[in-house]
């Protein structure tokens, strides 16, 4: 349960991976929120004169071992720990202990799947809530708590997964809670995530966390950054690295260009000669580089998902839990009305019902269409058949110069809005710049007619035929789990569309998947790109594009006005389709670059 540090095997004294050997892997450790480092200041709503507790191994803390015992499957062990903690904190002489442990108590009251824990600490907080100005805790600012899967859910698989996560980490974080809508996917996601982040592998554990920080910073995702900074310290990472990239090893700095390209213009990565990464005194082994590519793409994807679902900061980990500093959101959980949703939903339902009978006709007519033009049109929002919003599309360009982030977000249909957004205010931009430095590239649309780069053919380099093989060669445990994750998201269906049942949503899901990869410059010869504009409304395309290109610009309006009547769990499913397709596309660009280098040697 407790992070006991790492073996030194596979690391130099400075914590860098040793040499180029992929046979020396780092042994896993796990983290607990009850080992918060004092670097994190307490959230303003609780006061500004104290910090979350230091490691529970601190002998001066009489409650440390009891808090850790809450992460026990044994009911009696938990009961004893709860009684001791509550009795100790109820002593009027122990007010300082309450202050020191308040974030932890809030977490236990709101993020535990065990009723004995959540009820005990919720009851403890009630009489002191006003005294300590404890804010209302929210999992997401887009959806009411009542619509989320309960932590003590009756669904057996979801309950087991929530309990396993709590027993390992001491909390069911907001990201996990949201994914509880889709427990079968959550199970596969956790297996893959734990493998690439915590199991033995080419890179040290704290390097994995830091690469996650660098990737999340590209999309200004403070939620992911806070989680990874915390776990970085749990894994004995050098706290100086968290001051920014000026304090990290040259070997890690060399990866910044790759991260920048994968985040914003991955189609330029094949033009980058990665020989500088694998040669010299700060060289990456191929195994380390493959692991890094998987990590980068994972955290770019996760950052997009956080913004898609409006996930709120974690108590005790973020620099501020005062939502007013990050969101301009009323307390109302009322959905923003989407006037076009009913009509568009009826249209797409009819299309889905009739699609099977039309498939043969489409196959016969394929040769009549210019596939290159269809591919181009799929990326043009103005070509969407469901023009239910007045969206201005982003102008394509043949240049590789970057565009201003604010300009990009507005041209993509975001505009100025008073709706809540997860992007940070301008006075907090420096928080991300320390992890970005001079690598200031932002999104520019892929131009299908550009002479400066090529369309990426999925037939010439695909995940199944090529990417999987490369990952399995250098990181064999990860390859099948990534494959399962991709396959499951693509095929996952409940045969429902809003309240309509027995609906085959494959054409709709397929349109989302291939639209994302079209935005990333990837062509699938065997897909009819006319389906993109047939099934996706302009506003939905706008949401999906933001999710995979500049997710920090997503607003509550974007989430609420997708052009279709979708339930929150269906919007989560839609978001997963988008970000997992993005993850696969980015990973293919990264792995293709590695293969290119190997072929040239």
Curated annotation (Swiss-Prot):
Database matches in PANTHER family: P53 REGULATED PA26 NUCLEAR PROTEIN SESTRIN, SESTRIN HOMOLOG
The organism's place on the tree of life at top rank: Eukaryota
Protein name per Swiss-Prot or TrEMBL: Sestrin homolog
InterPro entries: AhpD-like, Sestrin
Compositionally biased region (Low complexity): 21-32, 380-425
Disordered: annotated span: 1-58, 355-425
Residue ranges with Basic and acidic residues bias: 368-379
Pfam families: PA26 (PF04636)
Principal subcellular localization: nucleus
SUPFAM superfamilies: AhpD-like (SSF69118)
Keywords recorded for this protein, A-Z: Cytoplasm, Glycoprotein, Nucleus
CC terms in the record's Gene Ontology section: cytosol; nucleus
Single Gene Ontology MF annotation: L-leucine binding
Location of the protein in the cell: Nucleus; Cytoplasm
GO biological process: cellular response to diterpene; cellular response to L-leucine; cellular response to leucine starvation; negative regulation of gene expression; negative regulation of TOR signaling; negative regulation of TORC1 signaling; positive regulation of macroautophagy; regulation of response to reactive oxygen species
Compositionally biased tracts (Polar residues): 1-11
Stated family: Belongs to the sestrin family.
Function: May function as a negative feedback regulator of TOR function.
Nucleus among keywords: yes
Annotated transmembrane regions: none
Glycosylation sites: 20, 322, 330, 387-388, 406, 438, 499
């Amino acid at each position: 349960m407790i992070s006991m540090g790492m073996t030194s095997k596979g690391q130099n004294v400075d914590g860098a991976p040793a040499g180029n050997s992929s046979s020396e892997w780092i042994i896993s450790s796990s983290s607990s929120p009850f080992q918060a480092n004092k670097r994190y200041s307490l959230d303003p709503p609780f006061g500004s004169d104290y910090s979350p507790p230091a490691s529970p191994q601190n002998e001066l803390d009489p409650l440390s071992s009891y808090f850790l015992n809450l992460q026990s499957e044994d009911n009696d062990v938990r009961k004893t720990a709860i009684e001791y903690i509550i009795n100790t904190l109820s002593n009027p002489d122990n007010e300082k202990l309450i202050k020191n442990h308040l974030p932890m108590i809030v977490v236990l009251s709101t993020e535990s799947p065990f009723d004995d824990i959540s009820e005990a600490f919720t009851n403890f907080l009630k009489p002191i809530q006003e005294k300590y100005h404890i804010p209302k805790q929210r999992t997401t600012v887009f959806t009411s708590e009542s619509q989320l899967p309960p932590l003590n859910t009756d669904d057996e698989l979801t309950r087991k997964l929530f309990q396993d996560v709590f027993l390992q980490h001491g909390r069911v974080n907001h990201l996990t809670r949201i994914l509880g809508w889709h427990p079968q996917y959550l199970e596969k996601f956790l297996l893959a995530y734990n493998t690439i982040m915590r199991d033995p592998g080419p890179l040290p554990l704290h390097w994995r966390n830091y690469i996650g920080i660098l990737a999340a910073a590209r999309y200004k995702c403070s939620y992911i950054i806070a989680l990874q900074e915390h776990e970085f310290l749990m894994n004995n990472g050098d706290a100086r690295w968290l001051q920014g990239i000026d304090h990290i090893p040259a070997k890690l700095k060399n990866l910044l260009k790759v991260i920048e390209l994968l985040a914003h213009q991955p189609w330029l990565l094949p033009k980058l000669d990665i020989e500088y990464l694998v040669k010299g005194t700060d060289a990456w082994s191929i195994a380390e580089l493959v692991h890094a590519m998987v990590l980068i793409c994972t955290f770019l994807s996760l950052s997009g998902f956080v913004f898609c679902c409006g996930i709120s900061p974690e108590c005790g980990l973020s620099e501020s839990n005062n939502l007013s500093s990050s969101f301009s959101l009323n307390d109302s959980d009322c959905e923003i009305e989407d006037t076009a949703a009913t009509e568009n939903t009826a249209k797409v339902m009819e299309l889905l019902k009739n699609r099977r009978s039309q498939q043969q006709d489409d196959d016969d007519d394929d040769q009549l269409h210019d596939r290159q033009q269809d591919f181009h049109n799929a990326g043009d929002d103005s070509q969407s058949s469901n023009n239910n919003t007045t969206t201005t599309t982003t102008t394509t360009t043949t240049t590789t110069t970057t565009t201003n982030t604010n300009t990009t977000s507005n041209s993509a249909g975001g505009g100025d809005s008073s709706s809540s957004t997860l992007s940070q205010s301008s006075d907090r931009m420096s928080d991300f710049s320390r992890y970005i430095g001079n690598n200031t590239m932002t999104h520019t649309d892929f131009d299908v007619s550009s002479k400066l780069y090529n369309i990426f053919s999925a037939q010439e380099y695909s995940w199944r035929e090529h990417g999987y093989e490369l990952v399995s060669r250098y990181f064999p445990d990860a390859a099948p789990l990534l494959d399962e994750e991709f396959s499951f998201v693509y095929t996952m269906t409940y045969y429902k569309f809003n309240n309509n049942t027995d609906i085959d949503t494959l054409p709709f899901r397929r349109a989302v998947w291939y639209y994302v990869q079209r935005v990333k410059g990837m062509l699938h010869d065997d897909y009819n790109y006319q389906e993109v504009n047939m099934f996706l409304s302009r506003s939905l395309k706008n949401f999906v594009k933001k999710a995979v290109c500049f997710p920090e610009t997503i607003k509550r309006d974007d989430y609420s006005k997708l052009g279709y009547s979708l339930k929150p769990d269906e919007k989560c499913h839609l978001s997963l389709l988008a970000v997992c397709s993005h993850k696969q596309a980015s990973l293919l660009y990264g792995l293709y670059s590695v293969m290119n280098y190997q072929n040239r040697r």
